[in-house]
Amino acid sequence: MQHAHVIGLGKSGCAAALLLRQQGWQVELSDRNAVAAPPELVSQGVQFRLGESLDPVAWGWQTPEQRPNCIVVSPGVPWDLPGLRQAAEELQIETLGELELAWRTLSDIPWVAVTGTNGKTTTTALIAAIFERAGLQAPACGNIGFAACEVARQQQQGEAKPLDWVIAEASSYQIEAAATLAATIGLWTTFTPDHLNRHYTLENYFTIKASLLDRAQQQVLNGDDPYLRNQANATSRWPLAFWTSTQGAEALPTSRDRGFWIEEGWVIDRGDRLFPVERFSMVGNHNQQNLLMAVAAARLAGIEAEAIAEAMANFPGIAHRLERVATWQGIELINDSKATNYDAAWVGLQAVPGPTILIAGGEAKQGDDQAWLDLIQAKARAVLLIGSAAPLFARRLAEVGYSSPVENAETLDRAVPRAVELAQSLDASHVLLSPACASFDQYPNFEARGDHFRRCAQAIAKG
């Protein structure tokens, strides 16, 4: 029996372990932070090393009979961990990510794979909604929805209807560990500096993202993204790629016969009018960019315009991305917890109409904050800060001359009611959580942060 070692007890790691057991592997799972083994994995015969970091020497892997045939790595596990590098480089143990394992299981099914610094979650959800409206079995998975290995496990076990497509959101963490994933359609939404604590340089980050499109049969890129359009040499790297633009055909970096654009209020597919953009239920230019990317994927997959238009008109949006969670005395409270960097937070604040009380902060990331700070000066009546980034953000706001109130609320429990008070006194129409930060100083993930904000907001709305 072949032996696999899975690192990480999160959603992806558990799904990988169950898929491997279903395929007949002996599976051991480790997690240095976990203390309890999930009963559903124990019942399937998965073995555990909890509270331990990978250590090939201490675990006896130098003896060939003791070492695993492969290591499956969850997305949150850095690839430069000393023990992992030793296992992969010195002991020559095959090392792959959970998404790669799912691909190897489902490679006979066409995939749409979506990556990008920002916009990929909404675009992935839009694509899945369109495919569903068209009557296709095409679940969203990867960095959204199910873990990809859970989709693969259900398909292999016959627990779900046969798949027509797989719609995968792929983060840079997942792509770097998915060396053979070759999507039928690969999409790249945006590119700005992010995750540099993991990838170290912008060039490394770009190379990882680009590899997904290198292996895809067809590529779709956002022509409104300055980096992809002007600095990435993308038109020469992928000369047959399709491009999108909300600014009309003239703004495309390619010919019209490889373009999707908006013109005179219509969504255009390579010169053919599909439907009025006003049928799309979500607001904001960035969401029109996401819309065009999703339309391109759907049309390349052969889906008719009417199914696309119906899906667009009924799309509710996604949790934690400009999610309207409550209204109190005319003040809208909006959860944008997924805005984990400056660019995403700029997009969120820009999309909210009217004067706003902004809640920001968390675990700060590297990046250029100037455009975000400029927009705060223009739109925010006050800023409430939370988390470890609060002193940094307060200093930066002072440095750019922001003269409206800035308060360190420390936590959302304090920030949300105070934001509502300030909205009343300063005549602001919206309270927006758009942190521009990771969540890990106070929460396990951005979803938990957004859920907490939603509870706080709804408690106020209920009085």
Curated annotation (Swiss-Prot):
Q: Which NCBIfam families match?
A: murD
Protein name according to UniProt:
UDP-N-acetylmuramoylalanine--D-glutamate ligase
Molecular function GO labels = ATP binding; UDP-N-acetylmuramoylalanine-D-glutamate ligase activity
Compartment(s): Cytoplasm
Q: Which residues bind ATP?
A: 116-122
Its cellular-component GO annotations read: cytoplasm
GO biological process assignments: cell division; cell wall organization; peptidoglycan biosynthetic process; regulation of cell shape
| HAMAP family per the UniProt record, alphabetical | MurD
Q: What class of enzyme is it?
A: ligase
Domain of life per record: Bacteria
Q: Which reaction does it catalyse?
A: UDP-N-acetyl-alpha-D-muramoyl-L-alanine + D-glutamate + ATP = UDP-N-acetyl-alpha-D-muramoyl-L-alanyl-D-glutamate + ADP + phosphate + H(+)
Has UniProt tagged this entry with the keyword Transcription regulation? no
> What functional role does this protein have?
Cell wall formation. Catalyzes the addition of glutamate to the nucleotide precursor UDP-N-acetylmuramoyl-L-alanine (UMA).
Q: Which UniProt keywords apply?
A: ATP-binding, Cell cycle, Cell division, Cell shape, Cell wall biogenesis/degradation, Cytoplasm, Ligase, Nucleotide-binding, Peptidoglycan synthesis
Q: What EC identifiers does the entry list? A: 6.3.2.9
Family listed: Belongs to the MurCDEF family.
Name the predominant localization.
Answer: cytoplasm
Which pathway does the UniProt entry assign to this protein? Cell wall biogenesis; peptidoglycan biosynthesis
Origin species:
Synechococcus elongatus (strain ATCC 33912 / PCC 7942 / FACHB-805) (Anacystis nidulans R2)
Which InterPro entries does the record associate with it? Mur-like_cat_sf (IPR036565), Mur_ligase_C (IPR004101), Mur_ligase_C_dom_sf (IPR036615), Mur_ligase_cen (IPR013221), MurD (IPR005762)
